[in-house]
């Protein structure tokens, strides 16, 4: 009887420690040490929350950097993708569809310049990261689009965007990894640039 009681006490104790104390303590430490990360890295512009730097959205405007294709149309409630193999005809058809869409959105880009990630969906369907090259080849289209609403020099806009992209690049693995950029972060910088210049209003975001 005593052994059963001892086992029950230990079970309740461990349940309390591992189910309540440990999660609570780690949560409090994280909230104070890394408040931005612990809150999901929210996108805040002029006091309003518009999303998260961790989640891609369907940035359809021509003056935005476009993310990777999404099998779920960037639906936050349905994270995931198709389970097609690379040789599956359906996968090949989707890749061809994404390729034609990218080329139509970015005239002048050569097929050989397009990273495969830009014409294939991510595993979650919400990945905000794209290859550095995938961002750079979008700059001409974005420069012209911003010029059309600001009348600023296309060459100056290209330089601004090129520097912006390269200043935010990160490696997916230290030292030897490929360079990626976060499209949400880039697009937030564009929005803030346009807001600051008075080219768009808060209601247009």
Curated annotation (Swiss-Prot):
One of its GO terms (cellular component) is plasma membrane. Signal peptide: none annotated. The keyword Nucleotide-binding applies. GO terms for molecular function: ATP binding; P-type potassium transmembrane transporter activity. Pfam families: KdpC (PF02669). It is found in: Cell membrane. InterPro entries: KdpC. The chain crosses the membrane at residues 9-29. Keywords: ATP-binding, Cell membrane, Ion transport, Membrane, Nucleotide-binding, Potassium, Potassium transport, Transmembrane, Transmembrane helix, Transport. It is a single-pass membrane protein. Part of the high-affinity ATP-driven potassium transport (or Kdp) system, which catalyzes the hydrolysis of ATP coupled with the electrogenic transport of potassium into the cytoplasm. This subunit acts as a catalytic chaperone that increases the ATP-binding affinity of the ATP-hydrolyzing subunit KdpB by the formation of a transient KdpB/KdpC/ATP ternary complex. Belongs to the KdpC family. The system is composed of three essential subunits: KdpA, KdpB and KdpC. This is Potassium-transporting ATPase KdpC subunit. It comes from Thermoplasma acidophilum (strain ATCC 25905 / DSM 1728 / JCM 9062 / NBRC 15155 / AMRC-C165).
């Amino acid at each position: 009887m005593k052994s059963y009681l001892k086992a029950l006490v230990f079970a309740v104790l461990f349940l309390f420690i591992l189910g309540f104390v440990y999660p609570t303590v780690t949560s409090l430490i994280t909230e104070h040490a890394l408040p931005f990360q612990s809150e999901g890295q929210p996108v805040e512009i002029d006091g309003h929350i518009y999303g998260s730097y961790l989640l891609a959205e369907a940035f359809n405007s021509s003056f935005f950097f476009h993310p990777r294709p999404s099998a779920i149309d960037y639906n936050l409630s349905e994270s995931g993708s198709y389970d097609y193999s690379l040789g599956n005809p359906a996968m090949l058809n989707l890749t061809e569809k994404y390729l034609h869409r990218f080329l139509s959105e970015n005239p002048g880009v050569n097929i050989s310049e397009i990273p495969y990630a830009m014409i294939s969906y991510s595993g979650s369907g919400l990945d905000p990261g794209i290859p550095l090259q995938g961002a750079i080849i979008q700059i001409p289209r974005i420069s012209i689009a911003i010029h059309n609403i600001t009348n600023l020099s296309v060459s100056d806009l290209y330089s601004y965007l090129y520097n912006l992209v390269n200043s935010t690049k990160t490696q997916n693995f230290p030292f030897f990894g490929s360079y990626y950029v976060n499209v949400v972060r880039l697009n937030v910088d564009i929005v803030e640039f346009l807001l600051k210049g008075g080219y768009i209003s808060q209601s247009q975001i």
